[in-house]
């Protein structure tokens, strides 16, 4: 191969790398003259993660409406429903729904945390898992998450905000878990790989910052590798359910900015790939 062509190929590759390095987890979707924007979110961030990549503000400014995973007005209702459903009815206990070895292990863990058995045993395993994953326990804040930032901007600019899921649909993601799935969700917190990878939140934030939704999806799916049905439930199934709604937004005549967790955007079963597979043109910003 002549040296000049080799140099041209290397130069083109470098340009591609530089362009990719400057990308954000924001995509422009077009279908004919219709336009929609997708934004990958990290639900909880740190103050040093600001300012957000400029593409988020550009997509917001170009849009008429903002769509999050759940309508913010319904989120409080959903949270109340999840809190209520996360507790067993009076007379029932966690002990009756998990393997005895799991219960004994949890009893030791919560004893170290100085939590009485009567307190933690009131809750279903999936709810205990949510409690242990609370961002505030890991130095992050949901009030600094991407959605919260954009919701505040939407309110300040009188832009309508809606959700891909209703309060009930969002709550049902957890409420319809079987005892086995619920126990698996909690056990994930105590697997050696999970304990060793305590910085996964930071790793996901770094991938999101450089526009690498595929890595965010991989991290999430790796967490579910021992319990693949949970990965299907929390990511893949919801992605597929959202596609008809997103296509409806795209054909509505209005410009929507649809924001969901970055892990929903990447991978072969992510929103970006699913829309591209249906013939829509997608450009990462």
What are these regions (language model features)?
Residues 229-285:
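A cross-kingdom marker for long, charged
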